[in-house]
Design a protein with these regions (language model features):
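Acidic, low-complexity intrinsically disordered segments
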Residues: 1-205
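Radical SAM enzyme core and accessory elements
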Residues: 1-3, 23-24, 31, 43-52, ...
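Residue-level signal for short, function-critical loop segments
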Residues: 6-7, 56, 217, 247, ...
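Hydrophobic positions in alpha-helices of CheY-like receiver
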Residues: 22, 66-70, 74, 228, ...
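Hydrophobic anchor at the start of a short beta-strand
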Residues: 28-30, 77-79, 211, 241, ...
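Short acidic/polar active-site loop segments enriched in Thr and Asp
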Residues: 48, 99, 209-211, 266, ...
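Radical SAM [4Fe-4S] cluster-binding motif and immediate context
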Residues: 144-305
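A structural motif corresponding to the C-terminal lobe/cap of the Radical SAM core domain
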Residues: 222, 233-412
Length: 454
């Protein structure tokens, strides 16, 4: 049995890919997306091998009760936790009853564990090295249909069914706050183009009109990436897609941006994180405030929609900084491009994070909290933490509101707290950019409401 608790509103690639490996080896595999379907106790109790996918922090916290239940109902089962957040939380996972902890490129190790289990052998230790795998086409049979997952809302109000895949894994960069870094250590691995294209074709046949590439950075290998885009667009000319690309890479590979636009790229997500150069240096992001402005201009000139994401609240933020962030988003005409949840994101500090290397952060940190799987931090200015709570509450009560309306309310609130004059409101109007109805976020503390809802 393979279990996912949350995968950003996508049909879980982290179940479909290992399912292909296990089924090829002759195993009967049940895939359960617990964000969509009930986890049946009878299935848990009868499984020989239980794998729980942990691709992000929210999924990991939600997995705790699932793992405990599996161990209680099925003491002899071999329980594996796999994915980016498994190695980061290994002691906690083992305390819950997990037998095996796998990080990146987990498919071959899962298959090896299954092979040893079927032969009655003790599981052999897995390597700490990141292997180079020849992947299989993900097997999505048994998963909920794509129509039950996030959709892409177009500017004209129509919606597209969304599929997802990965053209590469890991990342060659070392951003301090990123969960990829402790696992991949600056390495990335490409997925063979024929595998990616076959996965896309299968999802198009299943109704997908849009594909989200889940790569941490699509331009880690730009030649590989564009080969896939060119082939995909040739085979499916009406298929749109979105990708995630660093600001640094948007500048380095600016010549490729028009090709993305011409190939039906709906938008490019980029983790801007902050507009403060000092904070960007702390995070080791590889770009500056000015670089962000250049990327905005380059994307506009190429006809690409840039969707910036932020870690809006962090220990170095001032009220004035937050007002500047909001004002800049408005001045650059990016209000419709930013999911309101991005304005409430708070820095997450998990175990093994490179953030723990920063002397400038240590003074703000408390002891590791097993309940939240992170190091809690308190801002030196209590007004900042109070603002974060209020912005989070505001966003949570405006889930169906126009983005401009929400941003106007947040700007007014922030300027009031900072003792600044009220801003000129951003003119109203419907969103003129496509967006997913399950906002993308990472490297962040989950909204408590998200945890309760899921």
């Amino acid at each position: 049995m393979l279990i996912s608790t949350y995968e950003l509103g996508r049909q879980p690639f982290g179940l479909a890919s290992p399912a292909a490996w296990l089924r090829r080896a002759g195993w009967v595999v049940e895939c359960v997306d617990a964000a969509k379907d009930r986890l049946e106790e009878a299935s848990l109790a009868s499984a020989n091998l239980i794998g729980v996918h942990l691709p992000m922090h929210t999924a990991t916290r939600l997995a705790g009760p699932v793992i405990q239940k599996a161990r209680r109902l099925n003491p002899p089962a071999r329980i594996c936790a796999y994915g980016l957040y498994a190695p980061l939380n290994e002691p906690w996972l083992r305390s819950l009853g997990v037998d095996e902890v796998l990080g990146g490129e987990f498919e071959a190790d899962l298959a090896a564990i299954a092979r040893d289990l079927s032969a009655g052998l003790e599981t052999s230790a897995t390597s700490d090295k990141i292997p180079r795998l020849h992947f299989l086409v993900p097997d999505r049979s048994g998963l909920p249909p794509l129509s039950r997952y996030a959709t892409l809302r177009m500017p004209d109000g129509t919606r597209k069914v969304v599929g997802s895949t990965e053209a590469s894994r890991g990342c060659k960069h070392l951003c301090r706050h990123c969960p990829v870094v402790p696992v991949y250590q600056g390495q990335f691995r490409v997925v063979q183009p024929e595998i990616v294209l076959a996965d896309i074709a299968a999802q198009v046949a299943a109704g997908a009109g849009h594909i989200t590439f889940g790569d941490p950075d699509f331009f880690n290998g730009p030649t590989h990436a564009m080969h896939i885009i060119d082939a995909m667009h040739a085979a499916h000319p009406n298929l749109s897609f979105d990708v995630t690309i660093k600001i640094e890479h948007l500048l380095q590979h600016r010549n490729l941006l028009p090709r993305l636009a011409e190939s039906s790229c709906a938008f490019v997500t980029s983790a801007v994180e902050s507009l403060d150069d000092r904070v960007l240096a702390f995070l080791d992001k590889g770009h500056t405030r000015t670089d962000f402005f250049k990327a905005v201009d380059l994307c506009r000139a190429a006809g690409l929609t840039l969707v910036p994401t932020f870690v809006a609240f962090h220990p170095w933020l001032t009220l004035e900084d937050y007002c500047d962030l909001l004002d800049t988003i408005a001045e650059l005409d990016l209000v419709d491009h930013v999911a309101p949840i991005q304005l409430a994101i708070r820095l997450l500090v998990p175990d093994l994070s490179r953030l723990l290397e920063l002397p400038e952060l240590r003074a703000h940190l408390g002891a590791f909290d097993p309940a939240t799987l992170s190091y809690p931090w308190v801002h030196a200015d209590p007004r900042v933490d109070a603002l974060h709570r209020d912005v989070t509450a505001l966003v949570g009560t405006r889930l169906t509101s126009d983005r401009r309306t929400i941003v106007n309310e947040i700007r007014t609130l922030a300027r009031e707290r900072a003792g600044l004059p009220s801003p000129e409101p951003v003119a109203g109007g419907s969103s003129a950019v496509p967006y997913l109805n399950e906002p993308w976020y990472c490297c962040a503390e989950p909204n408590p409401d998200d945890v309760r809802l899921i």
